Amino acid sequence: MALIPLSQDLADILAPYLPTPPDSSARLPFVTLTYAQSLDARIAKQKGERTVISHEETKTMTHYLRYHHSGILIGSGTALADDPGLNCRWTPAADGADCTEQSSPRPIILDVRGRWRYRGSKIEYLHNLGKGKAPIVVTGGEPEVRELGVSYLQLGVDEGGRLNWGELFERLYSEHHLESVMVEGGAEVLNQLLLRPDIVDSLVITIGSKFLGSLGVAVSPAEEVNLEHVNWWHGTSDSVLCGRLA
């Protein structure tokens, strides 16, 4: 399905929150957290279930953001549940006109336990068509299987299986030359990074006009989080919040 045109007033709201060129002292990429949630802060009806929350207007926005980032990061749970393509279908010429590998961000899959496979995925399918890039897979040690076409980035994890976020983004910047990364999920990843104003530069959150219920997967960090430089956009049925971690 073709994307609908991006609203100009939405593009204007997003402009101050888009990646900026790094200066010579930069060690980290520009990091944007972006996701869609329901009115009760759920991003899925239940764990492992793909759930549509946002309107077509904000779907176009997602691809617009992908166009402006060099990497796109998700956890393995999201990769397994949704089998996303993680490519970009928006271009300045015309929405969806020239979906290419060059215009798409580099997929980054956090797969500490080695659950996800590139072969047979939508990411592989789109890469083979020349419409998306091959992924970087982040592992907690030496991967059991090394798949052709995949770049692997090994990181140590703590006793709870959590990654060192600072080291991860430093290495994505220095070793893979990614100057900007958008993080799309899942909940565990978002909840941890919402507590890292030292890493996260921008937030773009879509709020859909629905409730998903108490069984849904919530984005709710362990501590209070305040935002600053907040702007809102209101569409047909969604609202978009743009801001920065205080």
UniProtKB/Swiss-Prot annotation:
Pathway, per record: Cofactor biosynthesis; riboflavin biosynthesis
Lineage of producing organism: Eukaryota, Fungi, Dikarya, Ascomycota, Saccharomycotina
Family: Belongs to the HTP reductase family.
Taxonomic source organism: Eremothecium gossypii (strain ATCC 10895 / CBS 109.51 / FGSC 9923 / NRRL Y-1056) (Yeast)
Assembly notes: Homodimer.
InterPro entries attached to this UniProt entry: DHFR-like_dom_sf (IPR024072), RibD_C (IPR011549), RibDG_C (IPR002734), Riboflavin_Biosynth_HTPR (IPR050765)
Annotated protein name in UniProt: 2,5-diamino-6-ribosylamino-4(3H)-pyrimidinone 5'-phosphate reductase
Binding site for NADP(+): 78, 82, 163, 186-190
Enzyme Commission number: 1.1.1.302
Annotated GO MF terms: 5-amino-6-(5-phosphoribosylamino)uracil reductase activity; NADP binding
Function statement: Catalyzes an early step in riboflavin biosynthesis, the NADPH-dependent reduction of the ribose side chain of 2,5-diamino-6-ribosylamino-4(3H)-pyrimidinone 5'-phosphate, yielding 2,5-diamino-6-ribitylamino-4(3H)-pyrimidinone 5'-phosphate.
GO biological process, one term: riboflavin biosynthetic process
SUPFAM superfamilies registered for this protein in UniProt: Dihydrofolate reductase-like
UniProt signal peptide: none
Gene: RIB7
Pfam families xref list: RibD_C (PF01872)
UniProt keyword list: NADP, Oxidoreductase, Riboflavin biosynthesis
Catalytic activities: 2,5-diamino-6-(1-D-ribitylamino)pyrimidin-4(3H)-one 5'-phosphate + NADP(+) = 2,5-diamino-6-(1-D-ribosylamino)pyrimidin-4(3H)-one 5'-phosphate + NADPH + H(+); 2,5-diamino-6-(1-D-ribitylamino)pyrimidin-4(3H)-one 5'-phosphate + NAD(+) = 2,5-diamino-6-(1-D-ribosylamino)pyrimidin-4(3H)-one 5'-phosphate + NADH + H(+)
